[in-house]
Amino acid sequence: MIGLVMAGGKGTRMNLDDEKLLLEYKKPIILQVVDSLKNSNCFSKIIAITSSNSPKTKKLLQENDIEIFDTPGIGYVEDLNLILKTIDDDVLVTSGDLPLLDKDIIKKIVHHYNPQKIWTSVLVTSKFLTSVGIKDRKSVV
């Protein structure tokens, strides 16, 4: 299984001066996510999907010897489809802006993966968000 980290977005919703994935949560959040994937020991390789929208993030990933797949940065789905066309393996796709994602969560997701199904989606409940101190604004549960 290959771990894919989406790291090429513009991050415009946060209205920041710098790239969103460089925000610190113990360390830059993109590195927090990549390290969680690595520390789970679930993947044969980890690839970060970058674009011209995130040059500083790409540089940081390269400095940390993370494999890069560069895309045009058209959009999440378009960029993801580009790399999926080149991979003949199962993948776990995550956004690079999930600093609370840890190796144990990843192990549970991979453990519940069923290769007979085309895809698996992981959602969290309002109760979980509240338990980690996050105010839920868009919950349906």
What are these regions (language model features)?
Residues K10, D97-L98:
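Active-site metal-binding loops of divalent metal-dependent hydrolases
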Residues I49-S51, F69-P72, V122:
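Conserved beta-strand termini and adjacent loop/short-helix elements that scaffold enzyme active sites
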Residues S36, S40, L82-T86, K108, ...:
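A generic secondary-structure signal
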Residues M1-P55:
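N-terminal glycine-rich phosphate-binding loop and ensuing alpha1 helix
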Residues M1, K26, N41-S44, Q62-I66, ...:
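Short glycine/proline-enriched coil/turn segments at helix->beta-strand junctions
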Residues L101-V141:
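Conserved core of the sugar-phosphate nucleotidyltransferase
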Residues S51, T94-G96:
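Active-site acidic Asp-centered loop
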Residues K56-V93, L101:
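Short phosphate-binding loop-to-helix
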